[in-house]
From Swiss-Prot:
Top-rank taxon, per record: Eukaryota
Mutation effect (residue 88 to A): Loss of interaction with TIFY10A
Record: residues binding jasmonate: 85, 348, 386, 409, 496
Identification of the protein by name: Coronatine-insensitive protein 1
UniProt comment concerning the protein's domains: The F-box domain is essential for the formation of SFC(COI1) complexes.
CDD domains xref list: F-box_AtTIR1-like
Gene: COI1
Length: 592
């Protein structure tokens, strides 16, 4: 019989080891590392289950709500994504799916520790918001309705009425029905905890600037506010009251020919260092000069500035870390950025609207600007850019100098008939070899931009990339097969406008060992999709959206029907086939 003292000692050692593992586990935040740790043994699995505080689900159909709550009963933060990313570009049917209702039900019933909820590209009803508000009440600290739809201001009123201690409320780029402005008034009257309020890029028209001023006065911890198109002079009282504000985005500056200096006396909070003013023109730009040296983030996506205006402003922002703008910045603007902003970490350059006068050569981004940027801003970690011209040399420069780059996205516009240097095979190889920290990679070109050899380079030299978007790359199925022999850690693959057959796509999927999600639009589609069944396996859902004609408004305001090519969406799911597919989605279950 075992000695009682020895038995007690063994039990004590086990308990001590468990305590140590539990303490260590709290410092493991990368989901992939967490997953690996949980597979060591049953004890580690249980500790991970009990201590995991945050989960992000890249697609809400990959597991059932009750399975998630059983696996991680003590979650404090949950992020759910619904519609595929392509929905942001109007490529996915509005009724595709992504309903939050089953998740809200589970949160209300079983996830009692949850304090932060983030829904992205999902359909949210007023009933969902009301149930969430009543279930979590003052325990809910963060609610993000990120690019969501389906609710009204009644749902928001329920949230702010029942969740009086909410710290973050976000509705950026969401679409909804506005009945009144009671929700903001209620928030202003009864909340003293708010830190972040964001309804940027929304169409609220019935809310009062006075309520924003009251919020600023009552919530001393308010550090970030992003709003819609308020006339900026209506926010003078808000700016005066928001003593601790660090970030502001939105508003509206409207040039008045009869009053050229009407904004010159506008005073911003002294701690403001992240800023974006909608419709700011060159005449209003000087209001930023007094505190430009302290600006860390600048959003110029909706400013009305030309290339030289960018140059003038950027020179005055030597501590800039984040810049978002449009390609009107031009090569000249990027050269100034490279010269003056050595601490830049994130750069996003979107495509400018055609009506903004892009015919001016100054308003174009090309290899010249990219080379200057790579040499001058070597702290860059994120770079997303639309270019009008490109060379292999510019990509090689990025690989040579930007060693901290984790996320790189490049789109080659189709406005120029001739591109200086195609294909980009050698350039992309040099970039991927040099940027060893890359985790996210998007390369969206045009026909002839990348050969099969270049596509094989992407597979060979992307050992750590987890998400990838490829557009108009490769020449044949063989290129895709060579690509699929690499990318050992690729989890999400999106492709558009490629020449691959269904058979090649299915074969490539089976060779990518870590792949969990696939979206393809614009491939050699068949009538039946039968060849896609070669990638069928347990827990792997395959959905098709057949080609369809969709009404779109062109630049002249005319409504015309556009042809949308067929889509493939395939993903791992422990929940099986979803039950809410609309008629526009066809589920592949077995060979036809």
């Amino acid at each position: 019989m075992e000695d009682p003292d020895i038995k007690r000692c063994k039990l004590s050692c086990v308990a001590t080891v468990d305590d140590v593992i539990e303490q260590v586990m709290t410092y493991i935040t990368d989901p992939k590392d967490r997953d690996s740790a949980s597979l060591v043994c049953r004890r580690w699995f249980k500790i991970d289950s009990e201590t995991r505080e945050h989960v992000t689900m890249a697609l809400c159909y990959t597991a059932t709500p009750d399975r998630l709550s059983r696996r991680f009963p003590n979650l404090r933060s949950l992020k759910l994504k619904g519609k595929p990313r392509a929905a942001m570009f109007n490529l996915i049917p509005e009724n595709w799916g992504g309903y939050v209702t089953p998740w809200v039900t589970e949160i209300s019933n079983n996830l009692r520790q949850l304090k932060s909820v983030h829904f992205r590209r999902m359909i949210v009803s007023d009933l969902d918001l009301d149930r969430l508000a009543k279930a979590r009440a003052d325990d809910l600290e963060t609610l993000k309705l990120d690019k969501c739809s389906g609710f009204t201001t009644d749902g928001l009123l329920s949230i702010v009425t029942h969740c009086r201690k909410i710290k973050t409320l976000l509705m950026e780029e969401s679409s909804f029905s506005e009945k009144d402005g009671k929700w903001l008034h209620e928030l202003a009257q009864h909340n003293t905890s708010l830190e972040v309020l964001n309804f940027y890029m929304t169409e609220f028209a019935k809310i009062s600037p006075k309520d924003l001023e009251t919020i600023a006065r009552n919530c001393r911890s308010l550090v970030s506010v992003k709003v819609g198109d308020f006339e900026i002079l209506e926010l003078v009282g808000f700016f005066k009251a928001a003593a601790n504000l660090e970030e502001f985005c939105g508003g509206s500056l409207n040039e008045d020919i009869g009053m050229p200096e009407k904004y010159m006396n506008l005073v911003f909070p002294r701690k403001l260092c992240r800023l974006g003013l909608s419709y700011m023109g060159p005449n209003e730009m000087p209001i930023l000069f007094p505190f430009a040296a302290q600006i860390r983030k600048l959003d110029l996506l909706y400013a009305l500035l030309e290339t030289e205006d960018h140059c003038t402003l950027i020179q005055k922002c030597p501590n800039l870390e984040v810049l978002e703008t449009r390609n009107v910045i031009g090569d000249r603007g990027l050269e100034v950025l490279a010269q003056y902003c050595k601490q830049l970490k994130r750069l996003r350059i979107e495509r400018g609207a055609d009506e903004q006068g892009m015919e001016d050569e100054e308003g174009l981004v090309s290899q010249r600007g990219l080379i200057a940027l790579a040499q001058g801003c070597q702290e860059l970690e994120y770079m997303a850019v639309y270019v009008s011209d490109i060379t292999n040399e510019s990509l090689e420069s990025i690989g040579t100098y930007l060693k901290n780059l984790c996320d790189f996205r490049l789109v080659l516009l189709d406005r120029e008939e001739r591109i200086t240097d195609l294909p980009l095979d050698n350039g992309v190889r040099s970039l991927l070899i040099g940027c060893k920290k890359l985790r996210r990679f998007a390369f969206y070109l045009r026909q002839g931009g990348l050969t099969d050899l270049g596509l094989s380079y992407i597979g060979q030299y992307s050992p750590n990339v987890r998400w990838m978007l490829l557009g108009y790359v490769g020449e044949s199925d063989e290129g895709l097969m060579e690509f699929s022999r690499g990318c050992p850690n690729l989890q999400k693959l999106e492709m558009r406008g490629c020449c691959f057959s269904e058979r090649a796509i299915a074969a490539a999927v089976t060779k990518l060992p870590s792949l969990r999600y696939l979206w393809v639009q614009g491939y050699r589609a068949s009538m039946t999709g039968q060849d896609l069944m070669q990638m069928a396996r347990p827990y792997w859902n395959i959905e098709l959206i057949p080609s369809r004609r969709v009404p779109e408004v062109n630049q002249q305001g005319e409504i015309r029907e556009m042809e949308h090519p067929a889509h493939i969406l395939a993903y791992y799911s422990l929940a099986g086939q979803r039950t809410d597919c609309p008629t526009t989605v066809r589920v592949l279950k077995e060979p036809i």
